[in-house]
Each structure stands twice: as C-alpha cells, then as structure tokens.
Amino acid sequence: MRKAYTLYLLMALLAAVVMACVRKPKPTTTPWGTEVADVDDNSSERVTDHGSSDGITSLQQIMSNGEMIVLTISGPDTYYDYHGRGMGVQYLMCELFARRMGVTLRVEQCKDTTEMISKLNKGYGDIIAVQLEKRKYGDKKLRFCGAYEKKNGSNGIATQWAVNEKNKELASELDKWFKPTFPKLTLDYEDRLLAMAVTHSANWQPSGKAFAASRAEYDLLFQRYAPLAGLPWQLISAQCAQESGYDAGARSWAGACGLMQLMPSTAARFGLSREEIFNPEKNIEVACRLMGSLMREFSDVPHPEERISFALAAYNAGSGHVRDAMALAGKYGGNPHFWSSVEEYILRLGEPQYYQDEVVRHGFMRGRETYGYVRAIRRRY
C-alpha cells in the first residue's frame, strides 16, 4: 500500500509539468511543477551562507539558506541544458528531492569526478548527483546515499550518489526519499518531454490559406523590426514559422513564449516584462534585437550568409554550444567559419568522445534539433 501511494505521489508531481503551447502566460515551472523565478546570466554567482567551519553544509543550513548545490558532470544521464532548462535523469531526480525539501537547486558543473569530489570535500557543494562506483571511490571521504543503481545483476557494479562523509542527516534524508522505481519513472518522463519537443518541431510545417493568413498578419511587423537584426524580413518570418507556427499565444513546456518563443529571462535582458512577452509586436522586436546581437557576436565568421546560420543555431541552442562545435571543427580539420563543417559537430556533441573533448566548455548537447532548426529555416527562406 505504501509503495502504491509513493508511486501515486511521484506521478502526481510528474503530471504537474507545464505542457506545450498554452495560450496565456503562466508562472515558469521546472519539469517537476515547481514554480521558479527566471534568473539572469549571473545567477550562478549568487552568494549564500553556505558551509560551516569544517567545510560541510548541514541539512539544517541547507534548509535555512533555501538552496541546495548539486555537483555534476555533463552527459545525457547526468545533466545538460535544454532550451534553458536542466535535464538528465540524475538531475531531474535531484530536482525532485530539492522540491520535497522545499529548497531551490543550484547546479555546479564539473569537468570530471576528481573535481566533483574535491569541491564536495571543500564545502562547495552538497550532493554529487552522479552514479559513483562504490568500489572505486569508497576511500574518498564520501557517504554514499540516495539514488543508486546496480549494473549486471546482484553481482554487478554498485553505484550511488554521495555526500560528504560527515553529512549524516542529509544522507539519511536522501535514503528515506529514494525509491528504486524513481530512475525508470524519471527516464520515461524525460523521454516524453523530449518527444513533445520533437513533435512540436516536426509539426511546424503548416501550409494553405489559413497559414498564409496568419503569416500575412505579422508581415508589417517583420518588415518594421528586421532592420534591428540586419536581416531580411522574410528570414525573420521563416524563423517565426519554425518557432511557433505564427501562434502569438504559444508557450512551450520549457517556458518559451510567444511568436518567437522568447524565454522570459532573455526577454528581461532586453527590457521586456512578463506581462508584455506575448504582445506580438514587442515579441518580434526583442527577437530581432537578439538576432542582431547574435550576428554581431559571430562577427568572426567573415561571410554574412554563413553568419546567419551560426546566429540561428545560437538562438536555438545558445552561443556556448555553437562555439564548442566551432572549436571541434577547427581541431579535427574542418573550417570553423563554414556552417557545413560546424553542423557536423553540432550533431557529434551528443557523443562522449566529443562532448568530453578538452576544447568543449559547455558539455553534452542534443544537437539534432538545432541541426534541423537551421536547415528548416534556411529552406523556408
């Protein structure tokens, strides 16, 4: 009975996620339904009273601070950024635990396991939300707790999250919270979110009179604001078709809003409030200003037509991932200033050999969507 009730509660939390394309503004939510305020790019520099004289932040201090710091590495199972939202099964489970404790979650992304353990023991983080091999790291002043796996059956390799060996109360709470069903439920949930995003992208292939009428409704706005981007208005229109299908009320599960699917934090950087983000004219204006900023950011790409593809990719996935793909292209004999070379590494950033490469700074990426995004817009335009 208790197991069934636990599963019911977990599924209730999963069902609370914001679904794609609702028609009115709602509070931004995490994938678990937790309402959060959008933060600016400097949020990772937020200062809290984190740590004690022995370098350990107790459970009581975490609750008092209202923040838990998770140490992780980039990867499809651990943590990655997807349209401004944290994803990865280990991260999503940790987010669920933080919600249960009533605190926010801050991510500290590390390069490798050595860095994670070092930061944990120095008090720079509270939990390592990565499956660490107990046999290999059992002598590193760690207390294994929380989410665990056992590979290859009962005689296989045991792995688990970890906290500092002195943090007994936090370890106890993690052990009481975790249920063996959580990883599978979380993976299924993440798969549904990703499938929803892919379906959304694939379905934006409208045609016919109704679609033409929707497009024509905004043509004057595209013409008015495209000069802010230094781009043809027809390109901005094609981008809008890909982003929302000309649906001014569209909102994605990740919180992207309006015709040009602006994230509230991005809109705020350009002075656009939450209350105005669905306004078609202001949404288009900010998107054009953002595209203009990205075109300038990639001014090292000498050919203007090539630069457009880089700016579009950055609009979709963020400049960091695009720069990583450029670095990989340069390292492996491609031309980092030609999109035909770089798009290959946009795709390869989903492979460990490449997202763990020393030249990569922003880790794992689901690049197929960005690859298709640029191609679809260029094809329409």
State where each predicted segment sits.
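Bacterial signal peptide processing site
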Residues: 22-25
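Extracytoplasmic small-molecule ligand-binding "clamshell" domains
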Residues: 27-131, 174
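Ligand-binding clefts/hinges and TM-proximal coupling segments of bilobed small-molecule sensing domains
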Residues: 44-46, 176-213, 381
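A ligand-binding cleft/hinge motif common to bilobed small-molecule-binding domains
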Residues: 114, 118-121, 128-143, 323-324, ...
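A bilobed periplasmic-binding-protein/Venus flytrap-type ligand-binding module shared by bacterial periplasmic
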Residues: 155-171
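Catalytic and substrate-binding regions of cell-wall glycan-acting enzymes that process beta-1,4-linked
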Residues: 163, 306-380
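Export/targeting segments at the very N-terminus of extracytoplasmic proteins
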Residues: 197-246, 281-284, 299-302
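Substrate-binding/active-site groove segments that recognize
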Residues: 249-275, 282-293, 377
